[in-house]
Regions:
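C-terminal accessory/regulatory regions appended to core domains
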Residues: 1-166
């Protein structure tokens, strides 16, 4: 799988803005546009490149996918085992899921649970931000493992947040 940062000509950054991603996508799309090609083989190649450009932009626009791309690109060799989830975090996720289920028929309870999950999500987002920046600035086994763990926790809490909003 191609590095989406390389495809768009962007520096690898967790904090890349939507505006920067869209601007890079436009710039690359203009340069690779199939209408700029005259022969069928070049058009087909340009069409493939355009598809890769759009896929790279989509990947970078989603923070979880962007994080996965960074983790993939900075994966140590040999690849260490993925970190195990913290049992306390897993227990907390079970508690939140139970709270969501119990609050399913009461709007006030549902809102309270959603607010609690949103607060915990903000904390995990900050932790993920720090872990990803550390990985980019100091790519080592320890920072890679911390970034993978943070992304896994972020993914789990986002799922819980989506469930609480239903």
């Amino acid at each position: 799988m191609a590095d989406p940062f390389e495809v768009l000509g962007l520096p690898r950054s967790w904090r890349v803005s939507v505006e920067d991603i869209r601007a890079a996508q436009r710039k690359c799309s203009i340069a690779a546009h199939p209408d700029r090609q005259t022969d069928p083989a070049s058009r087909a190649n340009a069409l493939q490149l355009s598809s890769r450009i759009n896929a790279a932009a989509s990947e970078l626009l989603d923070p979880l996918s962007r994080g996965a791309a960074i983790v993939r690109a900075l994966e140590p060799t040999p690849k260490p085992p993925e970190p195990r989830q913290n049992p306390a975090f897993l227990m907390r996720m079970m508690e939140l899921r139970e709270a969501v289920d119990q609050a399913a028929h009461n709007a006030l309870d549902r809102n309270a649970v959603a607010t609690q999950i949103a607060q915990e999500l903000r904390v995990i987002e900050l932790e993920t931000d720090l872990a990803m920046v550390a990985l980019i600035t100091r790519p080592q086994v320890e920072t890679w493992s911390a970034a993978v763990d943070a992304l896994n926790r972020l993914r789990a809490l986002r799922r819980a947040h989506e469930e609480s909003a239903r």
